[in-house]
Each structure stands twice: as C-alpha cells, then as structure tokens.
C-alpha cells in the first residue's frame, strides 16, 4: 500500500482507532438513494439539461456553527439557484460544501512563528487554529464533534426543505443583503421582481396550486474533500460512502497511484478531482481512466 498523504500524526494511535470504530456505529449522514438521485441529476447536467451550483465554506469550523449561519448559506445558494434557473431556463443541481468540510490539506506539516514550530492547522476536525502547543496537537475526539455538527447540519437542512423554507415563492426573503450589497444588485433585483410577478400570476390565475416545496423543487446535496480516509471508510455502505453525497480528491492527494484516488475509484458516489496548475494532460487522462 502506498503512503497515505495528508494524514495527521495522531499522538495516541490506539485512541484514534477506537474513535474511528466508534464512528462506524453512528448513523449515516446521507443515504444511497439520495446519492443515486444525484447521479441521475448529474447525467442530465452532462446532457445540457441542468446546471450545477456548488458553494460553501473552504472549511467549516466548530465556532461558526448556528442555525442562522446554516440558513444564511442555504439562502445564498437558493438566491443563485433561482436567478440562474430563471436566466438559463435550466433546472439547477445544488451541491453544498457543507456538513463535513472539517478537515484541510496543508502544504507543510508544521508552522513556525517567532521561532516556535507547531503542527499545522488541519481543520477543526483535527486540531485548533489557535497557535498553542496543546491545541495544535491532533486530537481524534474532534472527529466526533465534526460528525455531530455534520449530522445537525443535515437534520436542519432536511427540516428546512420539508417545511417550505426552500419554496421559490419565498424568494424575496432569501438573503436580500446579497442583492443590496452587490454592484449588480439593481439587475438582479429586477430578475427577482420578475420571478415574483410570474409566481403571483400563476397563483392568482389558479393555473397551479402555489406549492413548490415538493421533493423535486429543491434538493441540496452535500460534498467535501475526502482527506482522512479512515474517517471516510467508517461510513461505507456497500460501495457507497455515506459521509456525503459527493466526494472529491484535492490537488495535493490526486496522484494517480495515491490511496485517495484508489479509494474514490471504488465508490458508487459521484466523485471529483481538483485539477490545479501543476497537473499535465497525461495525468488527467490517467486519473480519468483510473476513477472510471
């Protein structure tokens, strides 16, 4: 087996393995039927019938976690989705970098400040961003908190969708600040006004019932970078990795012979590979052949 890149140096390997075993007993974060639904939607994207929006934090944190913050992220995706769908006439596939983006790759394993060298910050799922000897030590207990916050985020998103928060008739309430603070705010406010007028007409004319919160109106799929492979493998359900609907391999771990590429090549999830400026065409072809 090749060396697994970008893995933390856990001070207590036995404790780490016990926590991974514990996480294996936890409920899945997503389900195979949801993953298969995303695959069907992505087929329509490939045919030119749908359009993907993927958005979210570079890395989620334990501190910036609340119902309002999650709603805020969802509102931004909703606003973009509605505007792009109205402008292109294409249905939108919404994929969030959310509910699992708690681990970061690093260029260097350590960081030095004022002559003090400590382990690099690898995301809240591994250690703290605080430059402190104790807090920078990789702590596997953080994986449990990452799981619980991911699960709470998923529960809130599902609840909001079921209760009509994502109904397009609520478009005027979705992140109005996004429009007012944008240089193109006037243009997009006009689009929102047109969408609202269209919905009002449909409702007033009695052409259809003014309910858009059915299961086909808006779905938010989750995604994150698959870095810590032991954690990802804890969510395996046959060939599905149920930590997220879609997983990707980053630029630092995408060598065609890496364990990360080997892992995603065996999944039934939709997967992706980040293509950076250092890659060449031959590598892209080799990765494509490997994961397909």
Regions found by a protein language model. Give the residues of each.
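N-terminal basic/disordered segments at the start of proteins
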Residues: 1-51
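N-terminal ordered "arm"
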Residues: 24-28, 32, 44-80
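Active-site-facing alpha/beta catalytic cores
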Residues: 59, 65-292
């Amino acid at each position: 087996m090749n060396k697994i890149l970008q893995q933390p140096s856990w001070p207590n390997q036995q404790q780490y393995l016990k926590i991974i075993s514990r996480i294996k007993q936890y409920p899945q974060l997503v389900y195979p039927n949801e993953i298969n639904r995303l695959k069907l939607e992505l087929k329509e994207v490939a045919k030119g019938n749908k359009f993907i929006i993927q958005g979210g934090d570079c890395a989620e944190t334990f501190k910036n976690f609340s119902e309002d913050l999650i709603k805020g992220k969802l509102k931004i995706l909703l606003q973009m989705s509605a505007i792009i769908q109205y402008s292109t006439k294409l249905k939108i596939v919404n994929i969030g970098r959310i509910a699992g983006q708690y681990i970061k790759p690093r260029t260097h394993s350590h960081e030095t400040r004022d002559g003090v060298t400590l382990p690099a910050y690898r995301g809240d799922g591994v250690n703290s961003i605080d430059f402190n000897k104790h807090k920078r030590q990789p702590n596997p207990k953080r994986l449990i908190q990452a799981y619980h916050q991911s699960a709470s985020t998923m529960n809130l998103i599902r609840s909001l969708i079921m209760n009509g928060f994502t109904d397009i008739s609520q478009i005027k309430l979705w992140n109005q600040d996004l429009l007012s603070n944008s240089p193109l705010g006037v243009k997009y406010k006009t689009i929102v006004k047109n969408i609202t007028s269209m919905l009002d007409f449909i409702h007033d004319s009695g052409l259809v019932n003014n309910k858009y919160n059915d299961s086909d109106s808006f779905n938010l799929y989750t995604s994150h970078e698959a870095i810590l492979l032991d954690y990802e493998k804890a969510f395996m359900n046959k060939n599905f990795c149920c930590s997220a609907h879609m997983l990707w391999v980053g630029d630092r771990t995408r060598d065609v012979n890496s364990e990360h590429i080997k892992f995603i090549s065996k999944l039934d999830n939709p997967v992706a590979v980040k293509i950076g400026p250092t890659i060449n065409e031959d590598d892209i072809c080799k990765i494509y052949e490997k994961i397909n």
